[in-house]
């Protein structure tokens, strides 16, 4: 009986901790800024081919979901998982990307070629950390992230996102940069595999002022590099 009671208490504590952690994580709605479909999906036994890809200024290559790659005849493909909700691990919380095998119509990412930027509003809260799922092709992308708070004050972070072919340092990766998806293949515009592995979706962590309510985020990119912005997630400060 005592052992059963102890196990029950442990389960209750674990569930409470998990629930508390989940309540602190916010998957931001960035639907208004999405402008590209770089992932081929499989819907009703039919491939919907990517239209604006991950490199070559959008016309080079794209990714496939695992089901799409298997349907395509690829053997043991290094493809994106069918479930676009990436599980939490030691480096990041759950991260929700915007592709789906049940959706053959809507855009999946925000792609920026050359100099440019995007701004999006978020649920006003105090945030400890923000996580941006990104890829940069044709070299690194140089970014400035501006945080606009409810009191109309701002703070900034200047960041460098490496090329999506680059391996991240193995001597305990920089805490602000980790893999979200690692060692991916890529496919041409006829869903022909052009490279079998070694490409990534990186996850960049930034830190707004946790004592202020954040209301919007502005990401500006300098001319070098081709940027694909996949998702944004926030971790509340309290």
Give the label of every model feature segment.
Residues 1-21:
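Bacterial Sec-dependent N-terminal signal peptides
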């Amino acid at each position: 009986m005592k052992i059963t009671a102890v196990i029950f208490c442990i389960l209750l504590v674990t569930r409470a901790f998990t629930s508390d952690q989940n309540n602190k994580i916010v998957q931001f709605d960035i639907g208004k800024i999405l402008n590209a479909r770089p992932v081929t999906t499989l819907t009703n036994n039919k491939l919907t081919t990517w239209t604006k890809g991950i490199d070559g200024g959008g016309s080079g290559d794209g990714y496939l979901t695992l089901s799409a790659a298997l349907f395509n005849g690829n053997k043991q493909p290094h493809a994106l998982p069918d479930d676009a909700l990436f599980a939490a691990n030691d480096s990041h919380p759950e991260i929700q990307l915007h592709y789906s095998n049940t959706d053959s119509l809507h855009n999946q990412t925000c792609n920026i070629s050359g100099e440019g930027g995007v701004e999006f509003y978020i649920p006003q809260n105090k945030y400890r950390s923000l996580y941006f799922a990104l890829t940069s092709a044709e070299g690194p992308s140089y970014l400035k992230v501006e945080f606009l708070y409810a009191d109309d004050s701002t703070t900034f972070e200047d960041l460098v996102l490496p090329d999506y072919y680059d391996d991240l340092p193995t001597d305990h990766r920089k805490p602000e940069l980790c893999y979200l998806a690692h060692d991916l293949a890529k496919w041409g515009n006829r869903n022909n595999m052009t490279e079998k592995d070694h490409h990534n979706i990186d996850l960049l962590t930034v830190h707004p002022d946790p004592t202020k309510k954040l209301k919007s985020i502005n990401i500006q990119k300098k001319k070098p590099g081709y940027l694909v912005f996949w998702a944004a997630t926030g971790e509340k400060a309290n």
